[in-house]
UniProtKB/Swiss-Prot annotation:
The lineage of its organism: Bacteria, Pseudomonadati, Thermodesulfobacteriota, Desulfobacteria, Desulfobacterales. This is Large ribosomal subunit protein uL23. One of the early assembly proteins it binds 23S rRNA. One of the proteins that surrounds the polypeptide exit tunnel on the outside of the ribosome. Forms the main docking site for trigger factor binding to the ribosome. Pfam families: Ribosomal_L23. HAMAP family: Ribosomal_uL23_B. It comes from Desulfosudis oleivorans (strain DSM 6200 / JCM 39069 / Hxd3) (Desulfococcus oleovorans).
Amino acid sequence: MVYHDLIRRPVTTEKTTLQKETANQVTFEVDRRANRVEIKRAVEQVFNAKVAAVNTATVKGKKKRMGRNIGKRKDWKKAVVTLMPGERIDFFEGV
């Protein structure tokens, strides 16, 4: 797999912002087929940051309604990447 295709987007919520500031952890939405080793290599190559640990979870899609029709969002995989002390990944700083 190409490393740029593994990482889909950063997950930006109140919780992930707090984790980034306090625990030096960054959260990404990643390809569902990716494993921890591939995610670690992708982050290290794409962002030039050393990774200490990777935790993953499959998030179930929510059920949604459009009038009478009931649908479901797709399931997705979340990766919480813990960076080594002194490392940083900046997404929106300076904007």
